[in-house]
Curated annotation (Swiss-Prot):
GO terms (BP aspect): tRNA methylation; tRNA wobble uridine modification
Recorded superkingdom: Bacteria
Subcellular location: Cytoplasm
GO annotation, cellular component aspect: cytosol
Protein name from the UniProt record: tRNA uridine 5-carboxymethylaminomethyl modification enzyme MnmG
Region (Disordered): 636-657
Assembly with partners or alone: Homodimer. Heterotetramer of two MnmE and two MnmG subunits.
PROSITE patterns attached to this UniProt entry: GIDA_1, GIDA_2
Species this chain originates from: Burkholderia pseudomallei (strain K96243)
Keywords: Cytoplasm, FAD, Flavoprotein, NAD, tRNA processing
GO molecular function, a single term: flavin adenine dinucleotide binding
Length: 657
């Protein structure tokens, strides 16, 4: 039957990508339907019970800055919070949280059920409705047909998923859930380029059988307790729990080696490529044969369960080998395994067949987000889902697509890497992937993106008001520090010595003093008995005050580096954002080699910047393209039209600093 209501956007899948996509399009005012095979698993953490980390935490902050749910849900469900790289520079500091699976899932579902313009429906999707070269809806397992102007597909590991434990395997999207076999077959009929990837998960352990007296405790940060959302509060956190650390040993490694003849990875049963940066334990032992030990983190799954996640022993070895290797580790000698570890193979589709909006180039209105694009990780999925949801909503509203640039967001880096370079293994975000990471920090994600989010319609009044209070306070106080001066006469020598190590010998602005190594904002404001501080509090709320101080300190201390990077961005941006016409035939560009023109015609880059990052492209080829565009008057700057955020970065340069 044809469902009587027509939607603007249909989102298929209720994982981290699907939930962010559905919430984003609904926030924009698009009538949105979220189709999931099981409403009870909305927002489920299928693998590790953690959010964030190096590069990943940056994505979560960006999702939050654009009004997304992941950071806020983590604040409500997080049972341990830490700042990684806290002793290093601000560009690489990252938030990571352990989450209670149940509380996190509840927080996501609560947001879905209370979001205006969003409908939920429990049914697996078996088919897409395609008319000509555009998608017009989806068909469920029992034949219900839903029509929509745009469809976002976020199928995770469910597309023709196959689960492996030793040499045994069976069809499944994850343990306990069916695979999407019919939908996978339908997508293959559409001739979208695809391949196979694999990922894995470790056995889960009953905490009542762990000897914690033999393990090293790893507590979270307590002073201050981190929060993930820019609107979050430490008071929102439930009870906090420690993690625990053990190690593999030579006996563990011998057990693993003895089982490799029954490993699906090493017997050719698994054909999909696994994640380089989250390898299975058997892969670690093989690749790092000289190491006699690997660190294993025992992470609590939640407050109402005894289950522990042993981070570091993802495996598809037979269960008897899993049992032996677990028992070989200190503190786990008597451990009971609650669930076996397994590997899962699944279909993905070459992201080079996508536009930077995450819309497929072949089928109008069809968007892909998450692991279907070859990425790995909750955070990468959520960020893509948010972007796909925004652009699906804009597509339905007949507005131009939006995607942040590489110099605007880690989300921009992620998408650009996917659509220009493709993937040969599951893609994971790192800070090292971003050329402009000093400007793309966790702490300024809101300064970079919230104004754009407001223009897009995904940022509500509460977030917008809080952002403006923060931005205005940072701007006012930074200006005060730059224009308030002290002299050897007005700053007592003993105070200067206590703060700077010696008296000052000429006039300094407070900003110049703050720029000194080891000098803090509070230290500067405390000079002259506090007279160097602001006349009124910057904020009443302690968390907001801490955020404001952090922005001020980083902006002033790193001003020179940030300005240098801004200049580099401006110089490189001249050609980076020049658009390539949709219908250009690259065989007609004089001077291009056959190989280069063939690649350009195959991947259809949207900008000169994207073209330059395609494998095999040369500076000479880019020059020929620029000449071709100039002669024909074809090129225009990306963002020169009505796309939101085209001018936001220039307007917010001071705020970002």
């Amino acid at each position: 039957m044809l469902y009587p209501t027509e939607f603007d956007v249909i989102v298929v899948g209720g994982g981290h990508a699907g939930t962010e996509a559905a919430l984003a399009s609904a926030r924009m005012g698009a009538k949105t339907l979220l189709l999931t095979h099981n409403i009870e698993t909305l927002g489920q953490m299928s693998c590790n019970p953690s959010i964030g980390g190096i590069g990943k935490g940056h994505l979560v902050k960006e999702v939050d800055a654009l009004g997304g749910a992941m950071a806020a849900a983590t604040d409500e469900g997080g049972i341990q919070f830490r700042i990684l790289n806290s002793s290093k520079g601000p560009a690489v500091r990252a938030t990571r949280a352990q989450a209670d699976r149940v509380l996190y899932k509840q927080a996501i579902r609560r947001r879905l059920e209370n979001q205006p313009n969003l409908w939920l429906f429990q049914q697996a999707v078996d088919d897409l409705m395609v008319e000509g070269d555009r998608v017009v809806g989806a068909v469920t397992q029992v034949g219900v047909r839903f029509r929509a102007r745009a469809v976002v597909l976020t199928a995770g590991t469910f597309l023709d998923g196959k689960i492996h434990v030793g040499l045994n395997h069976y069809t499944g999207g994850r343990a306990g859930d069916p695979a999407a076999v019919s939908l996978s077959s339908r997508l293959k009929e559409l001739n979208l380029p695809q391949g196979r990837l694999k990922t894995g998960t470790p056995p889960r352990i009953d905490g009542r059988t762990i000897d914690f007296s033999k393990l090293d405790e790893q507590p979270g940060d307590l002073d201050p307790i981190p929060v993930f959302s820019f609107l979050g509060r430490a008071e929102q956190h439930p009870q906090q729990l420690p993690c625990w650390v053990t190690h593999t040993n030579e006996r563990t490694h011998d057990i693993i080696r003895s089982g490799l003849d029954r490993s699906p990875m090493y017997t050719g049963v698994i054909e999909g490529v696994g994640p380089r940066y989250c390898p299975s334990i058997e892969d670690k032992i093989h690749r790092f044969a000289s190491k006699d030990s690997h660190q294993i983190f025992l992470e609590p799954e939640g407050l109402t369960t005894n289950e522990f996640y042993p981070n570091g022993i993802s495996t598809s070895l037979p269960f008897d080998v899993q049992l032996a290797l677990v028992h070989s580790m200190r503190g786990l000698e008597q451990a009971h395994i609650l669930r076996p570890g397994y590997a899962i193979e699944y279909d993905y589709f070459d992201p080079r067949a996508l536009k930077s909006s995450l819309e497929t180039k072949a089928i109008g209105g069809l968007f892909f987000a998450g692991q279907i694009n070859g990425t790995t990780g909750y955070e990468e999925a959520a960020a893509q889902g948010l972007l796909a949801g925004i652009n699906a909503g804009r597509y339905a509203q007949e507005k131009d697509a939006w995607c942040p640039r590489r110099d605007q967001a880690y989300l921009g880096v992620l998408v650009d890497d996917l659509v220009t370079r493709g993937i040969s293994e599951p893609y994971r975000m790192f800070t090292s992937r971003a050329e402009y990471r000093l400007s793309l920090r966790e702490d300024n994600a809101d300064m970079r993106l919230t104004e754009i989010g407001r223009e897009l319609g995904v940022v509500d009044d509460v977030r917008w008001d809080a952002f403006n209070r923060k931005r205005d306070a940072v701007s006012r106080e930074t200006e005060r520090l730059r224009t308030t001066w002290v002299t050897p006469k007005t700053l007592p020598a003993d105070e200067a010595t206590a703060l700077l190590g010696k008296p000052i010998d000429h006039e300094y602005s407070l900003a110049e003093l703050l720029r000194r190594p080891g000098v803090s904002y509070d230290g500067v404001c405390g000079l002259r008995g506090g007279e160097c501080g602001p006349s009124e509090p910057l904020a009443e709320d302690e968390l907001l005050l801490a955020q404001i101080k952090e922005q001020i300190e980083i902006g002033i201390k790193y001003q020179g580096y940030i300005e240098r990077q801004a200049g580099e961005i401006e110089r490189n941006g001249a050609n980076e954002n020049t658009r390539l016409p949709d219908g250009i035939d690259y065989t007609e560009v004089r001077g291009l080699s056959f190989e280069v023109s063939q690649k350009l015609n195959q991947f259809r880059p949207e900008t000169i910047g994207q073209a330059s990052r395609i494998s095999g492209m040369t500076p000479a080829a880019i020059s020929l393209l620029m000449v071709h565009l100039k002669k024909r008057g074809l090129g225009r700057r990306k963002g020169a039209d009505s796309v939101p955020g085209a001018d936001v970065q220039a307007d917010n340069t001071a705020a970002q600093q």
